[in-house]
């Protein structure tokens, strides 16, 4: 069992590998209207949004986590999957990530109406990643890149909780 505590002095590290190859254009779970790439983008965007919320206290954002996202597929290229202001960065403090989505979209979700039913609500949803589905699947190269990033991060944070 690890005794390291995640804090601003000892942040945690998350690295996500996103398959962005041509196979991600396939339907998700037998559905004809949602592709695997669509679901993956939604999931990673929700996950980053939830991590951001967990690190917010009032108007302040605390860097409890550093996050890396590696995309692999397009032209068999393996690289940081961030776009916009974060292009080319491989590991980002959560505050920088939270403050730099590609855009914010209006989405509809169902919520409890307080009387046992559901009502649709429009919510703001930050997007960091768009669905992509091009090229081959250089997964082993993605793992190699992740290992290099983790090795560098661990050297910089020797007392931190192990990366996930």
Regions found by a protein language model. Give the residues of each.
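Divalent cation-coordinating acidic motifs and surrounding scaffolds
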Residues: 25, 42, 52-53, 63-65, ...
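Von Willebrand factor
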Residues: 94-161
